Each structure stands twice: as structure tokens, then as C-alpha cells.
Amino acid sequence: MSPIMDALVPMVVEQTSRGERSYDIYSRLLKERVIFLTGQVEDHMANLVVAQLLFLESENPDKDIFLYINSPGGSVTAGMSIYDTMQFIKPNVSTVCMGQACSMGAFLLAGGAAGKRYVLPNSRVMIHQPLGGFQGQASDIQIHAQEILTIKQKLNNLLAEHTGQPLEVIERDTDRDNFMSAEQAVEYGIVDAVLSHRGA
């Protein structure tokens, strides 16, 4: 976060038996097993999310973790480090889309624990094929193009597994940017339900 954004993060003061204790709002929510994945998916952000997932597993391996996503997407390798950790750890990771989950954000949303993937009513979800850019010698460009196709196949297979859609449907629907409303994301199988109100 930038210094300006750091200054804008609210602090929460708690009374304890030893006096007052103050936390930034994200640290306080981490105590409630809530992690925020916001903005571009990149290596630094992915490392922070992975560290929080591992920490919460060590705190209580049997209690669900809640991952709130508002992301336009980003790096496939950074996203896969988060995805693999979500699948690896013992606690179920419940995913919640607020705002948008596009590209790798949508993939991580779908990768939450089955039956525990949610979207807020006015959020949007977008899936597409991975993007890549490379310049250099023709032979190196060919190597990188083949790697992008391999990654595309892997992501499509995993998305088919998490959504229950046939692979050929995933391949067709990710060929171009494919935007979905909250209800369409439920119908497609990326999430399990639209959350409009917190339960009583």
C-alpha cells in the first residue's frame, strides 16, 4: 500500500484485561478469519494472502477462512500460488466476490470450497483466456506461446472441475472476455449463491 493509503486505513481500539489495544482494520478482521484480496493479482499481494492463509491454518485447522475478492485479475503464476495454497490447507476457504472478480480473480472465486462460494448482488464476474506478451527471438516467442497454451489448458480444466461445466463449454466461453452478473455466475457454477443479506 502507498503511504497515503496506509494513513487512511482505520484503526480499531479494543479493551482487554491489560488495557487498550489498537489494530488496523485488516488485522482486526484477520482475527475473525477474514482475508481481503483486492486489486491486481501480483507476486507481493499473493505472498501476503498465502501467508495469511497459512497463519490462519496454524491458528485453527478446522475453522473456515473467508476470502473477500475485489480484483480485475493479474498474474497467472501469482494467482496459482494462492489457488494451490487454498487447496492445500486443511480449513475450507469460503470465497466472496464484492465489486468484481475478473480473470484470475474469477478463477480464485471459483476455487473456493464447494457450497461456500458467494457473490454480492451487484458484483460482476469475468472469465477469459490468459493473456501474454513476449518479445525476442522467434524461437523464444514460440516457446512462450506454447507455454501460454499449456497454461490455458490447465486453467480451463480446473475451471471445468470447479464449475461442473463441460470442458468444451469452458473453452468456448473463455475465448473472449465473458462478463456475468451475480445471477449468471451462480447459474454458470462459478459461485453457489448470491448473498444479499447476512443471515439472522
Swiss-Prot record:
The biological process GO terms on file are: protein quality control for misfolded or incompletely synthesized proteins
Q: Which GO terms describe its molecular function?
A: ATP-dependent peptidase activity; ATPase binding; serine-type endopeptidase activity
Q: Which residues form the active site?
A: S103 (nucleophile), H128
InterPro entries the UniProt entry points to: ClpP (IPR001907), ClpP/crotonase-like_dom_sf (IPR029045), ClpP/TepA (IPR023562), ClpP_His_AS (IPR033135), ClpP_Ser_AS (IPR018215)
Q: Which UniProt keywords apply?
A: Cytoplasm, Hydrolase, Protease, Serine protease
Give the location in the cell: Cytoplasm
| Annotated catalysed reactions | Hydrolysis of proteins to small peptides in the presence of ATP and magnesium. alpha-casein is the usual test substrate. In the absence of ATP, only oligopeptides shorter than five residues are hydrolyzed (such as succinyl-Leu-Tyr-|-NHMec, and Leu-Tyr-Leu-|-Tyr-Trp, in which cleavage of the -Tyr-|-Leu- and -Tyr-|-Trp bonds also occurs)
Assigned EC number: 3.4.21.92
Q: Which GO terms describe its cellular component?
A: cytoplasm; endopeptidase Clp complex
Q: Which NCBIfam families match?
A: clpP, PRK00277.1, PRK12553.1
Q: What does this protein do?
A: Cleaves peptides in various proteins in a process that requires ATP hydrolysis. Has a chymotrypsin-like activity. Plays a major role in the degradation of misfolded proteins.
Q: How does it assemble?
A: Fourteen ClpP subunits assemble into 2 heptameric rings which stack back to back to give a disk-like structure with a central cavity, resembling the structure of eukaryotic proteasomes.
Regarding protein family, the annotation reads: Belongs to the peptidase S14 family.
Q: What is this protein called?
A: ATP-dependent Clp protease proteolytic subunit
Query: To which species is this protein native?
Result: Vibrio parahaemolyticus serotype O3:K6 (strain RIMD 2210633)
Lineage of origin? Bacteria, Pseudomonadati, Pseudomonadota, Gammaproteobacteria, Vibrionales
